[in-house]
Swiss-Prot record:
Expressed in pollen, pollen tubes, sporophytic pistil tissues, in the early stages of female gametophyte development, and in unfertilized, mature ovules. Expressed in roots, lateral roots, shoots, cotyledons, petioles, developing leaves and anther filaments. This is GPI-anchored protein LLG1. Component of the FER-regulated Rho GTPase signaling complex. Acts as a chaperone and coreceptor for FER. Required for localization of FER to the plasma membrane. Residues 1-23 form the signal peptide. It comes from Arabidopsis thaliana (Mouse-ear cress). Keywords: Cell membrane, Glycoprotein, GPI-anchor, Lipoprotein, Membrane, Signal.
Amino acid sequence: MELLSRALFFFLLLSVLSSFSSSSFISDGVFESQSLVLGRNLLQTKKTCPVNFEFMNYTIITSKCKGPKYPPKECCGAFKDFACPYTDQLNDLSSDCATTMFSYINLYGKYPPGLFANQCKEGKEGLECPAGSQLPPETSAEVNAATTSSSRLWLTVSAALLVFVKLF
C-alpha cells in the first residue's frame, strides 16, 4: 500500500514539474514527422494534440510559400509565423502535434514531402522563434483548455485513489 501511494505521489510530482517547461525554438525533431520515420513510431502511441490544427488559417503559409520554386526565405518565414506560437506543443514529441500540423499544411498547400524539413534550418536547437511569438498566457490557456481539464481530471482521480488506498 505504501509503495502504491509513493508511486502516485511521484506521478503527481512529475506531472506538475513537467508543466513548467517552455521553449522559444521549434526543435528539429518536429520535422521527423514530415520525413515519415515509420520504424520507430510503430510501437509508440502518441497522445492527442491539445491544439486543433484542423480549423486553423493556413493562408499565412499558402499565400507566401508558392511553387514551383518554393523560395526558402518566404516559406521558412511563413512557417515560423504559423508554428512559433505553438512551440511547446510542437516540441512535445510524445504528442501527435507536429504530425497533425504537417498533415494539414500539406493538405492545404499541396507541398512536396519534406519541403520544410529540407529548407528550414537554422541553429543547433532548431528554428529560432522571435521574442513574443509564443501565445500569450490567456490565449495559450484557451488553446490548452482540453489539456488543462484533462490534467485536472487525472489529478482528481489520482487524489481520490490515493485517499481510497489510505482508507482501506
